[in-house]
From Swiss-Prot:
GO terms for molecular function: large ribosomal subunit rRNA binding; structural constituent of ribosome. InterPro entries: Ribosomal_uL11, Ribosomal_uL11_bac-typ, Ribosomal_uL11_C, Ribosomal_uL11_C_sf, Ribosomal_uL11_CS, Ribosomal_uL11_N, Ribosomal_uL11_N_sf. This is Large ribosomal subunit protein uL11. One or more lysine residues are methylated. One of its GO terms (cellular component) is cytosolic large ribosomal subunit. The lineage of its organism: Bacteria, Bacillati, Actinomycetota, Actinomycetes, Kitasatosporales. Keywords: Methylation, Ribonucleoprotein, Ribosomal protein, RNA-binding, rRNA-binding. Belongs to the universal ribosomal protein uL11 family. Pfam families: Ribosomal_L11 (PF00298), Ribosomal_L11_N (PF03946). Forms part of the ribosomal stalk which helps the ribosome interact with GTP-bound translation factors. The keyword RNA-binding applies. Part of the ribosomal stalk of the 50S ribosomal subunit. Interacts with L10 and the large rRNA to form the base of the stalk. L10 forms an elongated spine to which L12 dimers bind in a sequential fashion forming a multimeric L10(L12)X complex. The gene is rplK.
């Protein structure tokens, strides 16, 4: 007889610095209200994201009835990747009036390749269009 499926009691979505999860807010309160062992999650997350230090990594935590959990890490947000590629701190306050930086078509394709598993796109061209749109809405011009 196959083992019984565990009942899911919660789904938590967080964006945490890679390798820097700690029990302080926002991690502690979000997990605490579901009864998850916070330090156990922090250790597992930090080990899983150690190689991506410096990035903000979104994570989806599934909490089960017996208070156990599983988590899936995603790729860094497209906006953060665009900022890093353009070498700027933040996007434009008025994106369609003031342009703050330029990135090349090649950089857009590189970001799209990285983000492809998380995007709702069937191929690289569609993913590149999504990334280019995100860049435009941040006041970053795409050249090429």
């Amino acid at each position: 007889m196959p083992p019984k499926k565990k009942k899911v009691t919660g789904l938590i979505k967080l964006q945490i610095q890679a390798g820097a999860a700690n029990p302080a807010p926002p991690v502690g309160p979000a997990l605490g209200q579901h009864g998850v062992n916070i330090m156990e999650f922090c250790r597992a997350y930090n080990a899983a994201t150690e190689s991506q230090r410096g990035w903000v990594i979104p994570v989806e935590i599934t909490v089960y009835e017996d208070r156990s959990f599983t988590f899936i890490t995603k790729t860094p947000p497209a906006a953060k990747m665009i900022l890093k590629a353009a070498g700027i701190e933040k996007g434009s306050g008025e994106p369609h009036k003031t342009k703050v930086a330029k990135i090349t078509e090649a950089q857009v394709r590189e970001i799209a390749t990285t983000k492809l598993p998380d995007l709702n796109a069937n191929d690289l061209d569609a993913a590149a269009k999504i990334i280019a749109g995100t860049a435009r809405s941040m006041g970053v011009t795409v050249e090429g």
